[in-house]
Amino acid sequence: MAASQVDQKRALNKLKHDLEPFRTAIVGAYGVLTWEKQYYAGVVFGVISCLYLVLWYLDLSLITLLSLLGVISILLNYAFPMVSRLIFGGVNWDGDQEAKFEDVCGQVCAVKGSLVVWYEYLFNERKSTVFVIVMSLGLLAMAWIGAIINNLLLMYLATLLILMWPGLQNKDIFKAITQRASKIINEKIQCGKRKLQ
């Protein structure tokens, strides 16, 4: 094996070890996010919408919101392993669940590797002029959009997109949309060719 493959395997094993107390929740969340059942898409949409509705209603300042999120994450990190042993202690961990857990850990490692590559690319010393111009225009466009549209709405839409993405990919929604769009475009082209003849 190459050194990078050994490092990837070591990182995967470390991640699996670190996430071991949360594996039942991770496998359950993976099933919900990939829409193993038809109604999971509605559940994801509803939960996200309710959370953001509560955030909108409470109208917390950024510092208060970050502090509360920190407290909740610390409490969950402390209490969840104990509670999960009580709730899921009798559940048998089978090969299918282990395969899903390994798949999720592999995907997380792949995303982490991609982020490291992007970080190294974005923050290397030499940048081309085109890169600087394109990044500056992109960031200015994002700043302009952020100034025009409510930030909570933007975060809601971003969260919705991020959490719906695995299910959309798993159900081949994008593939169906692109096939339908290419079919419509091809029909329009054929219709235009017939009119020209």
UniProtKB/Swiss-Prot annotation:
<feature type="transmembrane region" description="Helical">
    <location>
        <begin position="43"/>
        <end position="63"/>
    </location>
</feature>
<keyword id="KW-0472">Membrane</keyword>
<comment type="similarity">
    <text>Belongs to the ARL6ip family.</text>
</comment>
<dbReference type="GO" id="GO:0071782">
    <property type="term" value="C:endoplasmic reticulum tubular network"/>
</dbReference>
<dbReference type="InterPro" id="IPR052114">
    <property type="entry name" value="ER_autophagy_membrane_reg"/>
</dbReference>
<feature type="transmembrane region" description="Helical">
    <location>
        <begin position="150"/>
        <end position="170"/>
    </location>
</feature>
<dbReference type="GO" id="GO:0016020">
    <property type="term" value="C:membrane"/>
</dbReference>
<keyword id="KW-0812">Transmembrane</keyword>
<dbReference type="Pfam" id="PF24456">
    <property type="entry name" value="RHD_RETREG1-3"/>
</dbReference>
<feature type="transmembrane region" description="Helical">
    <location>
        <begin position="64"/>
        <end position="84"/>
    </location>
</feature>
<feature type="transmembrane region" description="Helical">
    <location>
        <begin position="129"/>
        <end position="149"/>
    </location>
</feature>
<protein>
    <recommendedName>
        <fullName>ADP-ribosylation factor-like protein 6-interacting protein 1</fullName>
    </recommendedName>
</protein>
<keyword id="KW-1133">Transmembrane helix</keyword>
<dbReference type="GO" id="GO:1990809">
    <property type="term" value="P:endoplasmic reticulum tubular network membrane organization"/>
</dbReference>
<dbReference type="GO" id="GO:0007005">
    <property type="term" value="P:mitochondrion organization"/>
</dbReference>
